[in-house]
Amino acid sequence: MEPKTKKQRSLYIPYAGPVLLEFPLLNKGSAFSMEERRNFNLLGLLPEVVETIEEQAERAWIQYQGFKTEIDKHIYLRNIQDTNETLFYRLVNNHLDEMMPVIYTPTVGAACERFSEIYRRSRGVFISYQNRHNMDDILQNVPNHNIKVIVVTDGERILGLGDQGIGGMGIPIGKLSLYTACGGISPAYTLPVVLDVGTNNQQLLNDPLYMGWRNPRITDDEYYEFVDEFIQAVKQRWPDVLLQFEDFAQKNAMPLLNRYRNEICSFNDDIQGTAAVTVGTLIAASRAAGGQLSEKKIVFLGAGSAGCGIAEMIIAQTPREGLSEEAARQKVFMVDRFGLLTDKMPNLLPFQTKLVQKRENLSDWDTDSDVLSLLDVVRNVKPDILIGVSGQTGLFTEEIIREMHKHCPRPIVMPLSNPTSRVEATPQDIIAWTEGNALVATGSPFNPVVWKDKIYPIAQCNNAFIFPGIGLGVIASGASRITDEMLMSASETLAQYSPLVLNGEGLVLPELKDIQKVSRAIAFAVGKMAQQQGVAVKTSAEALQQAIDDNFWQAEYRDYRRTSI
């Protein structure tokens, strides 16, 4: 359902003069009316012509096109965001296909690596270990009192790039930009946070420009006590906030999620968001290929928290299609750098133990090796689906893909590793190796593939199809927790919007131009499930939809009225 056009009420503000022009959430630049210029002491501080936001956006678009590199475009857009947020979101929404890869993956990876070099202006909150005893004061310094969504990182596992220290702040900033651009959550309600617990990246420690705490990362009890102090301070300041954990290292991601998911409304996008969008993609791809997800045999390359999170959500989904959990687990095969996870493998992580295969059941496999490689697994399992979350480039070789296609006429191949430089195989190669028969979805954006004069659109399995809708649904419903069932309802809703399923052709995921519509539908499904699960107050469907409409922010200037401080 499209948002209803609503008349914006006037906004009463106490700021005036240059202070108002320096306030990104309120600045209109050349769009201040003559009356506003008189009332807010802006006469003579702006050029004579009063422009519309579309005229401003057109000028910004022309300027944007003048930049030749993606990182320069990223810096330019961040500068607009830090001076006029409403214009920033109007511009991004006007050119979402072009700009999403620039404000987020893959370009944000380079921005994180060069954070201290390209730093212009502070955005968000930096909480260093040195300031751990000032946590409450730091959060009180945040000027926006009604924060509803926080994205927090400690910068240790940024995309596939590893430890970026406080450079990881680029991820919460980019993620929250998508909460607004795709999910309609007002930027005034969002807060990016980086927990500066040091860095083990020697290059950063040796960099004279590095702006973070120059110290090796704290670990173990010190680390968990610091994170706990942060969580308690957030609960004290904003008890109803949605907290998203982002790009924490594997050793910390799952423990933190498990520790806090029932204490504060929180989720981990790398684990749960990635799982939700992947499951939604797989449901749609399975229907397009013929059949249900529960019928498919699935091989994962990468058995970290993200891969195992996806696998567990697939297993949780299959009972909806009539398959038992035990039977579902027998269809999922996890491969890491040591080979297939089996019950005879030592040193498994806790979240891996439920995803092993019994070695005794593999005695008839065609292999001469004790270590069961990805090729061994593909040859013997004959999977329908191959998912890459390894963070290592080139591991889906021609031999592996051709072996898969030999037994599966319509293989589903998903190299999900980010950024583009880490992808397990390129869509071009996968399409060629399967004679144009593979359904391909990637983690990073790729151009359509042309093979034998036919165009193959490549879907980006982008978490932005999921987390903005979840955030909007949580805010609109007032949900106090995010349950697995809420995530599964988001996946199912996403699958319902697949052009390939609806029309028999096109992308397996919706086009970006439809992302706000999809986010609103996901918000409704998530809010409804939250009510059914008892983590939100029950209302009518009409009331929930109205709450979504009321909370859906759009990049339009409001009329300003002067008030005293």
Curated annotation (Swiss-Prot):
NCBIfam families: PRK13529.1. The record marks D270 as: Important for activity. InterPro entries: Aminoacid_DH-like_N_sf (IPR046346), Malic_enzyme_CS (IPR015884), Malic_N_dom (IPR012301), Malic_N_dom_sf (IPR037062), Malic_NAD-bd (IPR012302), Malic_OxRdtase (IPR001891), NAD(P)-bd_dom_sf (IPR036291), NAD_malic_enz_proteobac (IPR023667). Its cofactor is Mg(2+); Mn(2+). The keyword NAD applies. This is NAD-dependent malic enzyme. Disulfide bonds: none annotated. The keyword Metal-binding applies. Belongs to the malic enzymes family. GO terms for molecular function: malate dehydrogenase (decarboxylating) (NAD+) activity; metal ion binding; NAD binding; oxaloacetate decarboxylase activity. Keywords: Metal-binding, NAD, Oxidoreductase. It comes from Shigella sonnei (strain Ss046). SUPFAM superfamilies: Aminoacid dehydrogenase-like, N-terminal domain (SSF53223), NAD(P)-binding Rossmann-fold domains (SSF51735).
